[in-house]
């Protein structure tokens, strides 16, 4: 085994970080120690994970994640269509002036209201029940599903819930996994908004990850989703 790879695997950060990456977590620059470790050993860990048929990716925004190949040896799950729609809304909010005005803090209610405002409400109600009438009860159930989705995306490292108020959160740069493919000169926020309103498919390269062992209250948001495979 190459010396530097041996050093990487012997590092005390590796066991927990490896588990997080395999569970689909994105490691951003705010995670100082883990991010610095990945920067130091990126080349060696790319070779290590290649043996499992997954790629260690460093995104242009600086965060790291594992991207599965079709022959990956690491178990995969899927994100539901609602998960991905909420992810697109989070990316839109990340690009919004409100993020700076609010010191980067949003509430779960603001997320829900933005979702209802920007996405097709009839389609959203189908996530609750195919025969949904849009009743107050259906809207309440949708709001509960959005909260569950937010918790799933938290585990993926895309949002951080504030420790003193679990109704408030900040958004990380990892939500750019849900971002539109923006051509030079275009307004990223406008392109993202068009993608949300048009209901375009997610341009995710290889899929996102989720550890099924942590699927508390998420059984209805799992493999019957969009079919985008996850490690």
Swiss-Prot record:
Subcellular localization(s) per the UniProt record: Cytoplasm, Nucleoid
Transmembrane stretches, start-end: none
A Gene Ontology term for the protein's cellular component: nucleoid
Entries under Gene3D superfamilies matching the protein: 1.10.10.2250, MukE-like family, C-terminal domain
Pfam families linked to this entry: MukE
Main location: cytoplasm
GO biological process, one term: cell division
Signal sequence extent: none
InterPro entries for this protein: MukE_C, MukE_N, Scp_MukE
Region: Disordered, residue numbers: 197-231
UniProt keywords, alphabetically: Cell cycle, Cell division, Chromosome partition, Cytoplasm, DNA condensation
Subunit structure: Interacts, and probably forms a ternary complex, with MukF and MukB. The complex formation is stimulated by calcium or magnesium.
NCBIfam families the record matches: PRK05256.1
Protein purpose: Involved in chromosome condensation, segregation and cell cycle progression. May participate in facilitating chromosome segregation by condensation DNA from both sides of a centrally located replisome during cell division. Probably acts via its interaction with MukB and MukF.
Similarity comment: Belongs to the MukE family.
The protein, known as: Chromosome partition protein MukE
The encoding gene: mukE
């Amino acid at each position: 085994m190459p010396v530097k790879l041996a050093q990487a695997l012997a590092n005390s950060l590796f066991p927990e970080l490896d588990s997080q990456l395999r569970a689909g977590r994105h490691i951003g620059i705010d995670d100082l120690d883990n991010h610095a470790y990945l920067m130091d050993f990126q080349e060696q860990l790319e070779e290590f994970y290649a043996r499992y048929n997954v790629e260690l990716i460093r995104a242009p925004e600086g965060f790291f994640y594992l991207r599965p190949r079709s022959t990956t040896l690491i178990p995969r799950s899927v994100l539901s269509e609602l998960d991905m729609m909420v992810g697109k809304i989070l990316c839109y909010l990340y690009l919004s002036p409100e993020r700076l005005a609010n010191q980067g803090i949003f509430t779960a209610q603001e997320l829900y209201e933005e979702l209802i405002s920007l996405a097709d409400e009839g389609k959203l109600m189908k996530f609750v029940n195919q025969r949904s009438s849009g009743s107050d009860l259906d809207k309440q159930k949708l709001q509960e599903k959005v909260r569950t989705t937010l918790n799933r995306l938290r585990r993926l490292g895309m949002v951080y819930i504030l420790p003193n108020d679990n109704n408030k959160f900040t958004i990380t740069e990892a939500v750019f996994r849900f971002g539109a493919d923006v051509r030079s000169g275009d307004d990223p926020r406008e392109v993202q908004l068009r993608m949300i309103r048009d209901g375009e498919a997610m341009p995710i390269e290889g899929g996102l990850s989720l550890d099924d062992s942590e699927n508390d209250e998420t059984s209805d948001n799992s493999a019957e989703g969009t079919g985008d495979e996850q490690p």
